[in-house]
Regions:
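Membrane-interface motif at the C-terminal end of an N-terminal transmembrane signal
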Residues: 32-38
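Bacterial N-terminal signal peptides
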Residues: 21-32
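Catalytic glycan-binding domains that act on GlcNAc-containing polysaccharides
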Residues: 38-194
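Bacterial N-terminal signal peptides that target proteins for export
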Residues: 6-23
């Protein structure tokens, strides 16, 4: 892959090939190297949670590493990313919803387009979901002791609903969603304590 990429670079496609090379290199350094310490513990917890729902060990391994990569890249708690993913798709890469949400993080096509990711690409979906979650944390994370909860509600209902109701909207789906994410997060957090 790297040789092919560098050959293309010499044929005039240097910038695109160089960006791809850097991406592959960075991913290999941050995700594929053996994990140590706290990262290994987080990996084990996320892998265990993913494997409870998704019995494919290769996918679960990849998902756990991708969550840690997205977490480090966008400064979002990896347990929160995993809790949202568990609630959204139960770690199923091909998940879809009647409303049109796609993939592991259940991105809506318009949201994915506005972020600039392909929602059908599992890594793009995780990165897009993490960016969207980071945006909601930036918007609502400072709303007192319930800031993270409000950000999670915004991930589900959209930020407009949060502004309209000055907090978590009265939608049953959103209120249930917040409870499910909180429950998943606390389960993951407790797994880290052992």
């Amino acid at each position: 892959m790297l040789i092919y990429t560098w050959k293309k670079a010499w044929k005039g496609e240097f910038l695109l090939a160089y960006i791809r090379f850097l991406f592959i290199y960075v991913v290999s350094l941050t995700v594929l190297l053996p994990l140590r310490g706290e990262a290994a513990d987080l990996y084990s917890v996320i892998y265990s949670d993913a494997s409870y729902y998704n019995g494919n060990p290769v996918e679960c391994d990849w998902i756990a590493k991708a969550v840690l990569y997205a977490s480090a890249s966008y400064n979002v708690d990896p347990l929160l990313i995993a809790a949202v993913m568990e609630t959204e798709s139960h770690f199923y890469m091909g998940a879809g919803s009647p409303a049109g949400a796609i993939g592991l993080m259940q991105l809506m096509p318009n949201t994915a387009a506005s972020i600039g990711v392909n929602p059908y690409d599992p890594l793009g979906n995780i990165i897009g979901g993490t960016i969207y979650l980071r945006t909601q944390l930036d918007n609502f994370g400072s709303w007192g002791e319930y800031g993270v909860t409000t950000a999670v509600a915004a991930y589900n209902a959209g930020p407009e609903a949060i502004y309209q109701y000055s907090g978590i909207p009265p939608y049953r789906e959103t209120r249930d969603y917040v409870v499910k994410v909180h429950r998943a997060y606390m389960n993951l957090y407790n797994m880290c304590q052992y």
